[in-house]
């Protein structure tokens, strides 16, 4: 009896370590898949997306341009870089600010796509979709509050202008050297693009997007099964301590992780399966998501300090606008109990609707990221 128990223990331990190794590989696969989707969008639409910025004739149009461009390119950092270049080329800062706000909303489409990996299980999908869309609702609420204030009083422009002078630096403080994700994903993506280039950039880009989405489904499905068996007892408590210990701790954790991985969409996408499988609750990841919003601004700010010459002040000012906007939005919305609950209620409501009717998901994505901005751009043009 004792011998059998002794033999079983190493087997159980080995199996558990294999599961952890498999989970780590699936995590890498998810990171790779998100990078594939982003790279595919950029490859297929990158140059065309820049044309969108020519339609900036009104702050609302600027907001929609930032939203659509980021949803297409799948990188708020890239869109912010384009905006910096446009400001340096003569675009007024007050016109660029709504674009930065739009970029905040556009970057949230990635985690919504990741949540679809749970679509086969109703309970998991409800939790995952709520976790994904809480980011959307927070950013939409932030824009509803701050865009009118900016149009009337120019508060973000004034604050960023006041802050920009002391932060001018001649040294290179770029964060590019700390990008941990790109080195482990770019070789695979480069190899895939090498194979798909024969179909042309647009078709190849679309194929890379489809392959990325399919990989997300595979990674999420396997991760879900593994996490259900692994995230119990002590492991679950450690994770909750790391993310859900308290609002300030969650915001700080989200900021640090996002600075390290250089992508808020990657950070928030990694939370979706954890909520979907019941390891964490939507309320646990809410502050973490707000931290991700701030973290992506810090990355852009530090990168902007590497810009030298006559346009350095513009790079810093736009980066500071992004940071100031997200910090003020976090303080105001999360600090006021009534406002704090609105993104949660909105996310839970649409998740309930999406669980009952999957067409709601398509309707939501099309409405927020295509129909609404497209219609507004057509009217303002």
Where are these regions (language model features)?
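Alpha-helical transmembrane segments of multi-pass membrane proteins, especially transporters
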Residues: 23, 27, 54-58, 66, ...
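Transmembrane alpha-helical segments of multi-pass membrane transport proteins and ion-pumping complexes
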Residues: 27-39, 43, 62-63, 67-71, ...
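Juxtamembrane helix-loop transition segments at the membrane interface in multi-pass membrane proteins
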Residues: 43-46, 85, 116-128, 224-236, ...
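Membrane-interfacial helix-loop connectors
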Residues: 70-104, 117-119, 153, 165-166, ...
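Helix-loop-helix hairpins and the membrane-proximal interhelical loops
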Residues: 4-63, 67, 188-251
